[in-house]
Curated annotation (Swiss-Prot):
Cellular component, GO, one term: cytosolic large ribosomal subunit
UniProt key word Signal: no
Keyword entries, A-Z: Ribonucleoprotein, Ribosomal protein
Keyword DNA repair: no
GO molecular function, one term: structural constituent of ribosome
Protein's name according to its UniProt entry: Large ribosomal subunit protein uL29
Gene Ontology annotations of biological process type: translation
Coiled-coil residue spans: none
PROSITE patterns, per database record: RIBOSOMAL_L29 (PS00579)
Similarity remark: Belongs to the universal ribosomal protein uL29 family.
Signal sequence extent: none
Organism: Erwinia tasmaniensis (strain DSM 17950 / CFBP 7177 / CIP 109463 / NCPPB 4357 / Et1/99)
Amino acid sequence: MKATELREKSVEELNTELLNLLREQFNLRMQAASGQLQQTHVLKQLRRDVARVKTLLTEKAGA
């Protein structure tokens, strides 16, 4: 997910996106803990996507 795509979204859409990313991250962490996750790089990508969304939410709150 690109930051430019996220910048076009509203605060409500960003909050929804954040919730979805956190749910997906939780599910992938459970798969990794049980040894079922084959593509471990997805966890890193999700963590960075969460950080991007949180950063944009903070920027929009300050503006």
